[in-house]
Amino acid sequence: MVVQTRFPSWIILCYIWLLGFAHTGEAQAAKEVLLLDSKAQQTELEWISSPPSGWEEISGLDENYTPIRTYQVCQVMEPNQNNWLRTNWISKGNAQRIFVELKFTLRDCNSLPGVLGTCKETFNLYYYETDYDTGRNIRENLYVKIDTIAADESFTQGDLGERKMKLNTEVREIGPLSKKGFYLAFQDVGACIALVSVKVYYKKCWSIVENLAVFPDTVTGSEFSSLVEVRGTCVSSAEEEAENSPRMHCSAEGEWLVPIGKCICKAGYQQKGDTCEPCGRRFYKSSSQDLQCSRCPTHSFSDREGSSRCECEDGYYRAPSDPPYVACTRPPSAPQNLIFNINQTTVSLEWSPPADNGGRNDVTYRILCKRCSWEQGECVPCGSNIGYMPQQTGLEDNYVTVMDLLAHANYTFEVEAVNGVSDLSRSQRLFAAVSITTGQAAPSQVSGVMKERVLQRSVQLSWQEPEHPNGVITEYEIKYYEKDQRERTYSTLKTKSTSASINNLKPGTVYVFQIRAVTAAGYGNYSPRLDVATLEEASGKMFEATAVSSEQNPVIIIAVVAVAGTIILVFMVFGFIIGRRHCGYSKADQEGDEELYFHFKFPGTKTYIDPETYEDPNRAVHQFAKELDASCIKIERVIGAGEFGEVCSGRLKLPGKRDVAVAIKTLKVGYTEKQRRDFLCEASIMGQFDHPNVVHLEGVVTRGKPVMIVIEFMENGALDAFLRKHDGQFTVIQLVGMLRGIAAGMRYLADMGYVHRDLAARNILVNSNLVCKVSDFGLSRVIEDDPEAVYTTTGGKIPVRWTAPEAIQYRKFTSASDVWSYGIVMWEVMSYGERPYWDMSNQDVIKAIEEGYRLPAPMDCPAGLHQLMLDCWQKDRAERPKFEQIVGILDKMIRNPSSLKTPLGTCSRPLSPLLDQSTPDFTAFCSVGEWLQAIKMERYKDNFTAAGYNSLESVARMTIDDVMSLGITLVGHQKKIMSSIQTMRAQMLHLHGTGIQV
């Protein structure tokens, strides 16, 4: 009896036919590259089956009634089945990792009768790599198993009747592959199975344009997690962004990951979608970094597509430093309204800006000087011996001073406005011109100074006329002083001859003599210094006896007349001094010993001389201030503005000396003669002072424009602003050191008889070593009768907060009123530049002071310092300390730093009432709330209550840290509250005589 081993194939075929109608084919994924698709082949597949009786190829129909080729096997009746089915050789192309998709049906073994021991529900999948087709033999041992394939769903006989479709799909991966191709093989071990379709493919990332970069087709990597980095290629007219080349990564699933880097359109092109298109006419793009094309700037054009810059129209230019987006410009027109002012051999030129600046803001001016002959009118360049102030070219201001011209000569000056494109233009120069004739010049330097005779108390000198007198010499001026005084105190003698005898000198003393000539044009330069030592007492008498005996009676008579004349002169000076005591003080009244303008000069002392006593202010400034050559001064930058002009920083380089940093005050253009006189008055005052704590005057420039006052440069500027900038950063010793320096400078001024009248922290300058120096020796100030009671100057108003009450009420300014101001300066320093009396009005300040109120101690101020402030604020000026005493007190504090740690209120003297704008004595308060309301800080009432400060005694113990812990963050409010607490604490100490523990 023959046992049937093959299950009826029509059952499976029928099921496949049903699937063809029920199953909808899937579209091929765009990221897959097919190597094999059995459904796509309508002819026989002709795969190899081993044994031939195993797998059989049958035909079916898909949903479109298109024939499809499938393989089936159903030998479930016999055990130990080994049926192989092998595909044809498959070329892998560029793939490294292959995907195999199987669609199949499988019969449920339980639905077949009599096959439970032999029926299987799985089959095996194999592959074999080879570089070529090996023929039709299947060498099973060469095949590598991929996996055992099982069905998720199997069908039964009932499914056929009910038309239930159960198609399985499985996908497996192969790789990495190293050879050119491979075979797939299917091993049946006793299942009833039909392969509906076999699809073999690999994945790749398809070409894409991203960020103007083209990324080509890229096969995925060999591993599941591998990423293939691909560098993009810029599209046409694009370039890679600097240090940011375009890259993308192709994932194992055939997807491009987030792009890195990008391409950008080149200059002259802009992006449009995934391409770069050229800029149109009249448009440009200068850089690849720009996003879009821009319209050509004014006075420029582009006549072709893809322009990276626009060309300038005729007559217009673009400077090398101008960016392409700037409009084309042209040279400026000529300056307007050129005027001149001749001062002997110096010419000042001023002009107005050009009507047309060419469309630029970098207009400067340059000066061309020509000297013209009298006869033929021919002109030649002036040469390098001419000086220009501030400079000849690159002038930013509309004025210049030309110096060192020849006397009685013809000159032509051309002033040209230039800008950044002037040198590019080939057009004719545009300038304003003026022709002038110089006048008489000052004489040149006196030479040949010789000592003719030297006695005990006199020296006779002779000299030669200047080589270039430049006119008629009206007189000679002899300046002399003791050598060890170094010009701090000097005398002058004038004569019309070329010799003179200087009398009333000290025996055995070295004197320095210098002589200069004077003409109608002005003063010449001083001659070189001549050192002469007078004879000693004994040798002088012997010499004088010899001189008398040799010259006989005429000399004796002359000596007697000279002595008599000297006595008469002394009496005249005394009379003049007494007369001035009854005439009053020209700036402001001073009392008694404060009128020290014509004191006799005793050895080692020097007296301040009021410049207003000179009929000619120019003589005063030349008497006390050194005239500087403007060419020695280099202005670097503007650092502020004064009452009469700008304040600049710069460098001063005198011949034979190293250059030094200086501050330069300039007189603005268009000044009046009174403004010039007032401006130079400060130099006449400063020139008399020589002290390390008083700002030093280097010199003045009066013979050119701009008129300048040159002083030493103080790096840290005004003291009040400096302290506010460095709030809380200094030790008490450092602050006391600053105060000591200010007091020393004021002591020096007081000893000279000078009353400052405007001492305030804003008028104290600080250098890099924290040395404080007194400054601002400016104009006369007149007190106005207005309710604010302020000084008025031509530059503005000065508040009364620093002024002593008698100076406000009676206009009495003395060193004692300066002491009051110094007390305010002390308060400013210890409070780090806080405004005295805060936001009180001037009228309230005057009223409070009259009622006996004074400023409270600043936060953390030692008691000794505050007591010194109170001493300076004594209403009776006679009870205020002198500056000499103040310096001594501060010196003791510095030598004994422990005295500066004494808390406020431990001093033996009772404190004066302390000023608070609206706070009466603390005993008038019944609660903390009333106290806060009185000082206008009631907003913090809840803060105090929440922290447990319910009594004034507890408040008096508070420190600044306690105040800050309440959540009070405004520094001004912290200081105001703390100042009031210190006031309260001081009054408690005074009332109870015992300290309050803090």
Swiss-Prot record:
Its BP terms in the Gene Ontology are: brain development; branching morphogenesis of a nerve; ephrin receptor signaling pathway; modulation of chemical synaptic transmission; negative regulation of collateral sprouting; negative regulation of phosphatidylinositol 3-kinase/protein kinase B signal transduction; negative regulation of synapse assembly; nephric duct morphogenesis
For this protein, what is the EC number? 2.7.10.1
Top class in the EC scheme? transferase
How does inactivating the gene affect the organism? Mice are viable, fertile and show no gross morphological or behavioral defects. However, topographic targeting errors of nasal and temporal retinal axons appear during development of the retinocollicular projections in the visual system. 10 percent of the embryos also display exencephalic overgrowth of forebrain tissues which might be the result of reduced apoptosis.
Enzyme active site: 758
Span of the annotated motif PDZ-binding: 996-998
Q: Does the keyword Transmembrane apply?
A: yes
Signal peptide segment: 1-27
Q: Does the keyword Nucleotide-binding apply?
A: yes
Main localization of the protein? membrane
Please give the residues the UniProt entry marks as glycosylated.
343, 410
- Please give the subunit comment from the record: Heterotetramer upon binding of the ligand. The heterotetramer is composed of an ephrin dimer and a receptor dimer. Oligomerization is probably required to induce biological responses. Interacts (via PDZ-binding motif) with GRIP1 and PICK1 (via PDZ domain).
Q: This protein is called what?
A: Ephrin type-A receptor 7
Q: Which organism is it from?
A: Mus musculus
